[in-house]
Amino acid sequence: MTRFAGPVFVAAGLRTPFGRGGGALSAYDAVSLSVPVVKAMAAQAEPDLLVWGTVIPNMGWSNIARETWLDAKLSPTVPAFSVVLACSTSMTATFAAAGMLGGGTELTMVGGSEVMSRPQIALTADASKRLTDLFASDPAAALGALQALTPRDYLLPTKGWANRITGRTMGDHMEETAKAWQVTREAQDDWALKSHQRAVAGWERGFFDDLVIPLPELARDANPSADTSPERLAALKPVFDRDSGTGSLTAGNSSPITDGAAGCWVATKAGLARLPTGTPYARLVDYEVSAVDFHTEGLLMAPAYGIPRLLARNRLSFADIGLWEIHEAFAAQVLANV
């Protein structure tokens, strides 16, 4: 089956290397880090539409897609809009673009960017109102009040990456899920070790050479480590549950704060023909968007609900799929979901 009026294809794009938070790419913001990807992809073909996303809010723009496209000095007549859905933002961009194909839109560029090194500092509602009122009535007094702001007048929009509803981070939630599903520390470390080994092997054999755009500050991913070993992983202490004695998520089996940008193509058959010969592609047949009550079911457990529904709708089983790619924020998350 397919949910689309005609065949839809996803074709390989490009990305930056992924840098560690506070590391080589921390001087970028989400727009400037997106520009090299968008420019390089646009050199292959000009899309009919750009759909781009980012999660961490920025007060400097409201439409990262349009800002990126124009900063890349590309045609101002190409429309662009932004999406956001937490860690699924770029995937959501793909689904949104797929639903807009046809009627002259044959080739779309989709993707996203995140610079977790640079969450913007904002003012509290009280401080913001105080300054806004002063600027309207007495600009000189407002400047004085601005200089007199104290730490309690500021806040991070992400509040230390915590969920707004629960006040807990993804790691806090995942620690609870790992306990609930009895995902052991050993299983997590084993999965993390394999992930490091596979990523390093991919770089060594040149798999990423035509997928990653080297930047002046960073040429390859900073996170995969060739010297990761079972012993080194086992020696790490829990980072989210440090007190109970049963914490299992560590810096070794959890993904770090990361900076990067990535894009791909979503196209009709006619759109594919506009890409360079030999561009890898796959057909997008269907998709599923799911949500959970993260007070009781775990913040990162939506795939456990979405995957069975998607398979059932297409009369497939888990074993029928030859390759699964599941967002690996934590080793425990993948293990709990599958």
Describe these PLM feature segments.
Residues 15, 27, 31-36, 187-274:
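N-terminal extracellular/periplasmic Venus flytrap/periplasmic-binding protein-like
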Residues 108-176:
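Flexible glycine-/small-residue-enriched beta->alpha junction loops
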Residues 2-72, 76-79, 87, 169, ...:
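Conserved active-site "lid/cap" helical segment
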Residues 46-53, 79-84, 108-112, 187-194, ...:
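Beta-strand segments within the central parallel beta-sheet cores of soluble alpha/beta enzyme folds
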Residues 84-114, 178-207, 263-271, 338:
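Active-site-proximal alpha-helical scaffold in enzymes
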Residues 28, 54-107, 165-169, 227-256:
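Conserved catalytic cysteine-centered active-site region
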Residues 11, 47-50, 90, 97, ...:
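Buried hydrophobic positions in well-ordered alpha/beta secondary-structure cores of metabolic enzymes
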Residues 57, 218, 285-338:
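Active-site pocket-lining segment
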